[in-house]
Amino acid sequence: EYYKTIVINFYNMVRKMDYANGGLGINEFFEDEGITTLGNYSEETCCSYNMLKLTDYMFRWNPDSSLIDYFENIFYNQIMCSMDPATGGKTYPISTAFGYYKIYSNAETAFCCCCCTGQESFSKLTYGEYYVTNDKSLTLMVNLFNPMTIKLNDQLTVKQTGDILLDGKSRITIVGNGKLTLNLRVPAWDKNPILKINGEKQTYQINNGYITIDREFSNGDYIDYEFNMSYRLDKQKGSENSYALFYGPFMLVCDLGNKDVDDIKDNQSDFGLPYD
């Protein structure tokens, strides 16, 4: 209990210093509470990787949907954007200042600790999506809304499909027959999602950030979960006029291309060069 208290206190302290996408630190240091300086050497990827692990432990202790709000943010907007889609190289920091670009690793001239945790991150893309308990009854907590199938037992399989980035919709289909409690997370970015069961719109109550569906399911039953993917601004901590723009859970960025940066793209010592 003593060490658990330390972990919770640490989490609550550093959350007061995170960037809009959940990343932490600049130059591998924490700043004063409530301050996040934008720069080229911010948000070390290893730090974000470990914050996901910490959040996972805390959620297992106390299943609170606000923990998954943070988990989702840092997963989509730091971890998922830390790999070069062309080469598989990983980022060390994620630059937060406008006009800076990412530098990716390679096996010959730029290889750091974040390459190793980065490999593990992309082997755990289902991490945090589902949590299963079977104390009093079989319960599946649906935390993230990415396509994924989970076999709960010999009688029941749950399949999630859809792409919320494209249309804000996710469908959960039941394969098999049996009793199941589904807890669907209500995300902070949409407190009023539309819920349909087998095509019929449902009313619901929200408890601890979740909608509970407790019933006997039949093979082929499906649940449609529809979100309002609206735009919103997130003010930078410690700044009066800097904001991040979000669309649903996704932080938006500007694609500035890579003109005139190819010559240093594999040199991780050149974090300080802005795109011009």
Please provide the spans of the model-predicted regions.
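Glycan-recognition and catalytic cores of secretory/periplasmic carbohydrate-active enzymes
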Residues: 1-276
